[in-house]
Amino acid sequence: MAQITINIQTLDWTMGETVGLHLMLKKDSKARIAWGDGKVQVVTGKQKPASEKLAWVEAGHSYPEKGMYYTITICSEEEDAIIGFDGCGMFEVKTFDVILTECPNLRILGYSGYGEEKLDVSKNPLLEFID
């Protein structure tokens, strides 16, 4: 199993309840995103049209309350399913941690838009690109 865990707090301002992220998954692999408030979203890996390259899959969620703490869990039953993660829409919440240690096959990481937390990538030996 592969898993990414993100601990956040929604902010008390107009845009403070929305989160967006991108995942790159193996073609036809599924990942389950538990948003921490009882809502779950399942996404499926895909390829770019007329190409062998994998495409980014978008996911997003709006939280019901401002100023609350949530733990987002992204997981796949397949250990090698999650190829890339980009928390591009995390700038509208306060991010405390992005835990990647249970996702050893991660190859691409988009790091912009998070808080000032430090990332431990020591358990991600296949990581090729950090943006």
Where are these regions (language model features)?
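N-terminal capping/linker segments that flank leucine-rich repeat
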Residues: 1-115, 123-125
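Solenoidal tandem-repeat scaffolds enriched in leucines and small polar residues
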Residues: 128-131
